[in-house]
Design a protein with these regions (language model features):
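Extended, compositionally biased flexible segments
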Residues: 2-116
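Conserved small/polar residues in nucleotide/adenosyl-binding loops
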Residues: 127-129
Length: 129
């Protein structure tokens, strides 16, 4: 069985080269998946400029075989201006997905509350769709 760092390296190289990997084991839990993502962040050396949320609909969750939304980093080198031509690897079947970007004036503090205060909502400086 491959160690997690080896898998992180393979996944990052596949992203760089546009390769599709079929033979890697899936993480055993969401916690293991986030640990793997942290290693990929380390291996990539990329600057993280924000995070995105994926699998927000039940249909996509079923397609990806997950039971809830998840988050992942946005890398600076992979962000593009609105009018940019974006290369697509020919080994993939491209999909289009709407993404919503929210830019905050300042970082929100992490707490265990599931609610967001009116003050925090007012900290939004820009919403881009």
């Amino acid at each position: 069985m491959q160690d997690t760092m080896s898998i992180a390296n393979q996944l990052w190289q596949a992203r760089l080269n546009g390769d599709v990997l079929d033979d890697l084991p899936s993480p055993a839990s969401i916690e293991a998946a986030y640990e793997l993502q942290a290693l990929i962040n380390q291996v990539s050396g990329q600057e993280i400029i924000g995070y995105k949320i994926g699998a927000t609909s039940k249909e996509i969750q079923q397609l990806l075989n997950v039971d809830s939304p998840f988050y992942g980093p946005l890398y600076k080198d992979y962000s593009n201006p609105i009018d940019a031509a974006v290369p697509v690897h020919t080994k993939h079947t491209p999909r289009v997905e709407a993404e919503f970007v929210v830019v905050l004036k300042e970082a929100l503090t992490a707490d265990n509350s599931a609610s967001i205060s009116r003050q925090q909502v007012e900290q939004l400086s820009l919403i881009h769709i």
